Structures are given as structure tokens and as C-alpha cells.
């Protein structure tokens, strides 16, 4: 267990950040699933999902290579 006030504060901050990252990642994953289900109908959703994935990579929630890989798979799926 943490002994200092600053260590306790860091734990609180880390827990909050973890929850925020988890939420953003989950919403992106559900958006990707929706796009996969409606790939031919919903072509307008790809730019939004692509920007979400880029934001995840920019915030280092996912690795930039993984974001490129996901976007590449989605483009192949749409075309």
C-alpha cells in the first residue's frame, strides 16, 4: 500500500485514467463491430471510426501499428 499522500493521489489518478481509456476503447470497438455488420450499407461511418482509432493511437491507448492494421482491415472489408 502507498505510504505518502502523493502516492495515494497517483493511484487515484491512475484508476480514473484507466477507466477513461477503457471506456474510449470499448466505444471504438463497438463502432468497429457495427461497421463490420453493416459494411456495405454504412460507408459514411468509416471516416469517423478511422478518426477514433487515430485518436486512440495519439493518446497511446493502442499502438500506432495496431491502429494502422485495424484501419487497413476495415478498408479491405469495405472494398
From Swiss-Prot:
GO annotation (BP), single: translation
Keyword Flavoprotein included in the entry's annotation: no
Keywords, alphabetical: Ribonucleoprotein, Ribosomal protein, RNA-binding, rRNA-binding
Keyword field contains Transmembrane: no
Entry's transmembrane regions: none
Single annotated GO MF: rRNA binding
Record GO cellular component, one term: ribonucleoprotein complex
Assigned protein family: Belongs to the bacterial ribosomal protein bS20 family.
Protein role: Binds directly to 16S ribosomal RNA.
Protein name: Small ribosomal subunit protein bS20
Organism: Karelsulcia muelleri (strain GWSS)
High-level lineage: Bacteria, Pseudomonadati, Bacteroidota, Flavobacteriia, Flavobacteriales
Amino acid at each position: 500500500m502507498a505510504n505518502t499522500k502523493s502516492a495515494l493521489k497517483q493511484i487515484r489518478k491512475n484508476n480514473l485514467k484507466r477507466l477513461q481509456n477503457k471506456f474510449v476503447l470499448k466505444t471504438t470497438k463497438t463502432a468497429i463491430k457495427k461497421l463490420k455488420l453493416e459494411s456495405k450499407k454504412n460507408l459514411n461511418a468509416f471516416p469517423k471510426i478511422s478518426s477514433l482509432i487515430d485518436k486512440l493511437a495519439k493518446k497511446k491507448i493502442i499502438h500506432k501499428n495496431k491502429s494502422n492494421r485495424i484501419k487497413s482491415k476495415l478498408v479491405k472489408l469495405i472494398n
